[in-house]
Curated annotation (Swiss-Prot):
Residues 606-629 have a biased composition (Low complexity). The gene is dnaK. This is Chaperone protein DnaK. Acts as a chaperone. Gene3D superfamilies: 1.20.1270.10, 3.30.420.40, Actin, Chain A, domain 4, Substrate Binding Domain Of DNAk, Chain A, domain 1. PROSITE patterns: HSP70_1 (PS00297), HSP70_2 (PS00329), HSP70_3 (PS01036). One of its GO terms (molecular function) is unfolded protein binding.
Amino acid sequence: MILCRGLFMAVIGIDLGTTNSCVAVMEGGDAKAIENSEGARTTPSIVAFTDSEVLVGDPAKRQATTNAKNTIYASKRLIGRRYQDTRDIKTSYDIVSAKNGDAWIKVRDKDYSPSQIGALILEKMKETAERHLGCKVEKAVITVPAYFDDAQRQATKDAGRIAGLDVIRIINEPTAAALAYGLNKSDKQKVIAVYDLGGGTFDVSILEIADGVFEVKSTNGDTMLGGEDFDHAIMEYLMDDFKKSTGIDLHSDAMAMQRIKEAAEKAKIELSSRMETDINLPFLSSDSTGPKHLSLKLTRATFENLVSDLVKRTIEPCKKALKDAGISADKIDEVVLVGGMTRVPKIIQTVKEFFGKEPHKGVNPDEVVAIGAAIQGGILAGDVRDVLLLDVTPLSLGIETLGGVFTPLIERNTTIPTKKSQVFSTAEDGQTAVTIKVFQGERKMANDNKLLGQFSLEGIPPAPRGMPQIEVTFDIDANGIVHVSAKDKASGKEQAIRIQSSGGLTDDEIQNMIKEAESKAEEDEKRKKFVEVKNNAENLVHSTEKSLKEHGDKISNADKLDIENAIRDLKDCISKDNIEDTDTMQNKLDHLMKVSMKLGEALYSNTNNATAGDNNTTDTGSSSNSDGSKVVDSDYQEIDKKDGK
């Protein structure tokens, strides 16, 4: 596949979502979401491992019930997180601790990082774009929740690298949505709030838009609040009801849990447009008395009662974002709803009550983030002009100082990219080395915040405590990724790192995963070829057997035996179902095609003979039929109307 011509065409925008993902591209000055191979503009963020292949998207979702243990969903909730922080997350698959303490996913006998799972979804998005554009894509802008910390942003970027993408920018989801909303409205100054409730995370951002400048004033959120939690609330309600009526606890039944999860998600969606919905799950379980079924009605009122605490949890971040921006709710000109969960009537009502105005519904909540990412790609490529995006860092960044105190160097909601330095000193006499521990968060004590990483500055000349001057510099790039350096002013000794947490993937691990992904791509292509050859072989066997049954009497016994042997050989090869036999199967298929041509030759020969028998005529010289009579060829002999000749 050729590389897309023109830089702007090669930059795609990807919304890597918890529940669904979407890819968009700039075309003719406008950004549009692209349909996948199944004809939908959103793709379920689900990956399934079967005995023979890896499935992504709708094919993975369709088989989830029968393969619950090996079907991975909502992996975005694990990306860049420590195992100890994910113990409350309930899934049908196994979450395990990696050697570095990160949360990984166990499938059969192998452990996968969430970045690897994310990479498989990104590969699907990449393929979708390439199929649409007709050329190879290498560059992408990928969105993340605004409240993602540095480790989660790094892990998302790693996923892009594993998928074979050059991630030229990481952009916050609410900011991307604001770009899509306000691209053609930026001539009018206004302040907007983007309320983004997706499948796994919640963000709220306050932005000021004027003269092509999109300036984020503040952002807040909750990376563990989203549609998955609403689904789980319904699931618990259904399982409690089932246990009361049958005495059976379904929590340890992976297949039943998967069926309940699918039913809960469907009910949640239906209750956005209906006042009640029926949930029927026959043969959900069984005991000594026979099969047990789940059947009940779920009303919108019951659903809203189940999720009321979850809805309330979105309000506190809204209050904090307004406070940090120095703006009251009544000064917000427009509230933009983003994420599939914002279709829920209770959410719409809550947003309306808090901000005192009807939310804006002019954007597609499922596609707007990817479209905004594509616009950002257009900006970076120079295809979209006169637009400036000023984003912020969501959390304060700083270091641990004497007594375990967290000392921020960059406060939250600081516009990025940014750089800031501060001078520190030693805590003990004669100290020749210092360890710099970098944290992100809002708590007063360092250990209550997220440790991003640490490094040491050595070779400091011995001196009384408080005498050495150590300059610590924080540099946050436009992706929100942190770089830190420390320099001893006296000796000139300096140590600089791009923050990589005590967890996270090393460059070697990423390179190995890239190689594995490339190898998987080769395996997938090999599997695809095998399936195509096998399908062709089965079709040929079927059609040849049918023809042999109907017309076998028209060929010699020797030819018939050759065809029967070729069919048997090809059937034996098909029954082995061995991908390594692809070339052998193709050869046997070719052989059957060759010998079965005898059937075709015999059929056409008989047809031609029959035709010749019916129409065997001559020109003016005439010819004899088997009975010796003369026949005149009507195609060549005109009949004289007068004498009838």
